Amino acid sequence: MDSKSLAKSKRAHTLHHSKKSHSVHKPKVPGVSEKNPEKLQGNQTKSPVQSRRVSALPSNWDRYDDELDAAEDSSISLHSDVIVPKSKGADYLHLISEAQAESNSKIENNLDCLSSLDDLLHDEFSRVVGSMISARGEGILSWMEDDNFVVEEDGSGSYQEPGFLSLNLNVLAKTLENVDLHERLYIDPDLLPLPELNTSQTKVSRNEEPSHSHIAQNDPIVVPGESSVREAESLDQVKDILILTDESEKSSAIEADLDLLLNSFSEAHTQPNPVASASGKSSAFETELDSLLKSHSSTEQFNKPGNPSDQKIHMTGFNDVLDDLLESTPVSIIPQSNQTSSKVLDDFDSWLDTI
């Protein structure tokens, strides 16, 4: 139903009710009075005419009552189904300003609530937990031992809030040094090389000895797979040490022989008659050289170094020592020596050349 038809039906309904109210009213019958008898007679003569007119023309408005009620019901149902715009348009600027004002008021209320809560928590936290934080861990130990701990509450102006989560880096570094390396890195000890593991364990043992001197020593913790690795590496180290000791002993023996030769030549220089003792010294020199060559050949047979570069270094050092020894021999002894000494020297030089 259109808005125009709805307006027409409302208008007809109002007119119908106004006419109906007028038609219902009955004409007033003039009262009987003694003062105007003439008017009473005139009215009595006119009243049957009016009653006839009313009876002759009955009202037919009752015929439209049902139709008007049906039209009103249909208009109400259609009006509830169809959304009729209240106005031609809305003021969007006004609506936006109202929404912004509401949002700002909500934000301010939330901020006020949060700030008050933050202030309350901060004050309570600083007063209750402040002394324990300043003690740097002592409060936690007191928790573990006894729950009844004393909190210092001072409301004076000299009260200062301790720094939240304040750390002493020096103390932390010292405590980390007391911990093993694999525990600091959260890895298995088998993954670390042995020297680093040993150094970390020695540091830990050195740091723990003064602090735990009054505690009995506990049994060492054996990690599976670690003992075999340590035993193998310790055996390798022992072998290296034995080889080095053998080489050092043999080198010391060679040096002792060379010292004897040098001492013999120095005694030859100090003697007043070198010509008389030349034959004796040459024979002693031959014997010393023979023993030296035998010892050197035996060391070469039993101890063959793994690297040829090490062998060359030892041989070059030995050759240099012998060259210095030969150069230090006196000139007076060399021409007076026997042919045997010259042959021995030639053989020795040829042997050095072959090396």
UniProtKB/Swiss-Prot annotation:
Skewed-composition ranges (Polar residues): 41-53, 296-310
Keyword Nuclease: no
UniProt keyword Cytoplasm, yes or no: yes
Tissue/organ expression: Expressed in taproots, lateral roots, root tips, leaf veins, cauline leaves, inflorescences, flowers, and siliques.
Disruption phenotype: Shrunken non viable seeds due to arrested embryo development when homozygous. Alteration in cuticular waxes. Decreased production wax with dramatically fewer alkanes.
Chief localisation class: cytoplasm
Keyword list, A-Z: Cytoplasm, Endoplasmic reticulum
Biased segments, Basic residues type: 7-28
Disordered: annotated segments: 1-60, 296-315
UniProt-annotated location(s): Cytoplasm, Cytosol; Endoplasmic reticulum
Covalent S-S links between cysteines: none
Gene Ontology annotations for the cellular component aspect, listed alphabetically: cytosol; endoplasmic reticulum
Purpose of the protein: Together with RST1, acts as a cofactor of the cytoplasmic exosome and connects the cytosolic RNA exosome to the SKI complex. Acts as a post-transcriptional gene silencing (PTGS) suppressor. CER16/RIPR can, like RST1 suppress the production of small interfering RNAs (siRNAs) from the CER3 locus, which is involved in cuticule membrane and wax production, and in the typhine and sporopollenin biosynthesis of pollen.
Subunit structure as annotated in this protein's UniProt entry: Interacts with RST1.
Protein name listed in UniProt: Protein ECERIFERUM 16
Biological source species: Arabidopsis thaliana (Mouse-ear cress)
Lineage: Eukaryota, Viridiplantae, Streptophyta, Embryophyta, Tracheophyta
Recorded name of the encoding gene: CER16
